C-alpha cells in the first residue's frame, strides 16, 4: 500500500492551508471574475487590430501556421511542441479555420479602417490562451517580458518561419495597455483556478493509493483546471 513520507505530508499541509484561503465562488462572483478575463482578451485583440507592427506580426503568424507549421524536431521538448499545435491546429492548412486564417492574414496586411481590421481579428476567433501567448510573444519582440508557455513555444517556432520576425518598438501607451491586459487576464484566470483548486484535491483523493502518487494526481488535475479556466465562458455556461 502506498504511503506518504514526511516531506509529502509537509507539502500537503502547506497546500491545504493555501486552499482554505480560497472558498468556492458564488455564481455572481464567478461571473464577475470571468468577465474581467474576457475583457482583457478583448482588449488585447483590439490592440492587435490597431497597431501596425502587431497587426503585421499576427498576419505573419497566420501565414506561417498555414505554410510552415511547427515541427516537433524544432522544439526542445515534445510537450512544448504539443502545446503550440493544440493552440494553432484550427489555423493549419487542414484545420477548420484555414480559410478564415488565409482571409485574415490578407485583410490584416491591407490598408483599411480600424473597424475592418478589428473585424478581421474577431473573425479569427482566437482562443484566450492563444491570444495571450501571441500578445506575450509580441511584447517580447518589443523588448518586454512576461511569463507564458504558449509564447515560449511561439518564440521557438518563429526561428523557423518563412521570414524570421524582426524586433520592433511600441509606443509607451501601447506597451502599458498590453501589460495591463496581460496582468488582468492572469489575475482573473488564477482567481478562477485558486477558488476551484479544492475540487482537484477532492477528486485526487478518490484515486489515492491506486499506483499514482497523490501529488502527481494533484499536479495533473491542476494543469487541467488551468486549461479549463482559460476556456471557461460564464455567459455560455461552460
Regions found by a protein language model. Give the residues of each.
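Charged, compositionally biased N-terminal leader segments and the immediate start
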Residues: 1-9
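Alpha-helical promoter-recognition and RNA polymerase-docking modules of transcription initiation factors
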Residues: 8-238
Amino acid at each position: 500500500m502506498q504511503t506518504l513520507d514526511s516531506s509529502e505530508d509537509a507539502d500537503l499541509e502547506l497546500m491545504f492551508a493555501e486552499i482554505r484561503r480560497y472558498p468556492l465562488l458564488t455564481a455572481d462572483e464567478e461571473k464577475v471574475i470571468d468577465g474581467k478575463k474576457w475583457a482583457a482578451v478583448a482588449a488585447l485583440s483590439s490592440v492587435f487590430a490597431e497597431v501596425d507592427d502587431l497587426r503585421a506580426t499576427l498576419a505573419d503568424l497566420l501565414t506561417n501556421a498555414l505554410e510552415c507549421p511547427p515541427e516537433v524536431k524544432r522544439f526542445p521538448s515534445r510537450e512544448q511542441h504539443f502545446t503550440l499545435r493544440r493552440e494553432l491546429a484550427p489555423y493549419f492548412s487542414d484545420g477548420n479555420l484555414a480559410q478564415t486564417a488565409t482571409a485574415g492574414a490578407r485583410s490584416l496586411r491591407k490598408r483599411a479602417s480600424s473597424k475592418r481590421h478589428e473585424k478581421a481579428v474577431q473573425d479569427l476567433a482566437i482562443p484566450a490562451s492563444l491570444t495571450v501567448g501571441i500578445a506575450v510573444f509580441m511584447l517580447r519582440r518589443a523588448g518586454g517580458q512576461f511569463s507564458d508557455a504558449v509564447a515560449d513555444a511561439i518564440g521557438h517556432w518563429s526561428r523557423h518561419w518563412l521570414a524570421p520576425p524582426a524586433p520592433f518598438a511600441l509606443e509607451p501607451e501601447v506597451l502599458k495597455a498590453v501589460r495591463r491586459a496581460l496582468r488582468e487576464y492572469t489575475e482573473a484566470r488564477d482567481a478562477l483556478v485558486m477558488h476551484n483548486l479544492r475540487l482537484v484535491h477532492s477528486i485526487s483523493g478518490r484515486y489515492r493509493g491506486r499506483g499514482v502518487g497523490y501529488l502527481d494526481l494533484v499536479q495533473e488535475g491542476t494543469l487541467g483546471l488551468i486549461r479549463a479556466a482559460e476556456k471557461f465562458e460564464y455567459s455560455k455556461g461552460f
